[in-house]
Amino acid sequence: EMCIRDRNGIGEPVKVWTKPGVSKSVLVSHPQTTDDFNSYTLGLQWQFNHNPVNTHWSLNERRGWLALKALKAATLRESRNMLTQKCMGYLSTATVLLDFSALADGQRGGLFCTGSLYNGIGISREEGKNYLYLEKNGDVQQVKMVSGKKIYLRVMLDAKKNRCQLFYSFDNCNFILCGDAYSLKFGDWKGARVGLYSYNTLGIGGKCYFDWFNYDFN
């Protein structure tokens, strides 16, 4: 556990505290999580990991899809325009449909989970060929060459067991575990988050299109 203390006299967050009294029964509510990207603006549940480069993401270029245009970066951790959400609940599953038909050589994009470690699953394009790949804290592993233009990516998080697993599917029914499970670790001040990314190791170029992002938790 970690408590960030700035000692500014305003007060600090606590893990457990007395629930405020209310005058009547109220329904439990939570922030929106799932997104079909049909709106002209991003939902309030989304958070860019850094100040965004607004010329390189769009909800209008291809209606109903989020377009992430790749900027140059060496690794996932350095990627610009990472779009994230807070991890919710003890058990959660995030699934996304990625269209990788517009990738450029050197580009990587997909779904990731981050804290102090950056772990992602996605598609990389090298010398005109597309590969399913894993990226774990800077280490890149090509899994297999893929054809077609769409893939379903999934991350499953278990906060009680401190475990995160990555999956892929070509039909949104049969998901295949990809790589070993890894631990979640607190990092920076934002905590663990799940999100989408696109970057290019060679320069600026290429696009990832995300049709929807589905997030279930308990």
Name these PLM-found stretches.
Residues 175-205:
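Flexible glycan-contacting loops in extracellular carbohydrate-active proteins
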Residues 205-218:
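Exposed low-complexity, polar/acidic, P/S/T/G-rich flexible segments that act as propeptides
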Residues 58-76, 130-134:
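Short carbohydrate-recognition loop motifs
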Residues 135-152:
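Short, aromatic/His-centered strand-loop micro-motif at the edge of beta-sheets
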Residues 2-4:
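Short, small-residue-biased leader/transition segments that mark boundaries at the very start
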Residues 9-48:
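Extracellular carbohydrate-recognition regions
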Residues 37, 96, 152-179, 213:
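Carbohydrate-binding surfaces in secreted/extracellular proteins
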Residues 73-129:
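Secretory/extracellular carbohydrate-interaction modules
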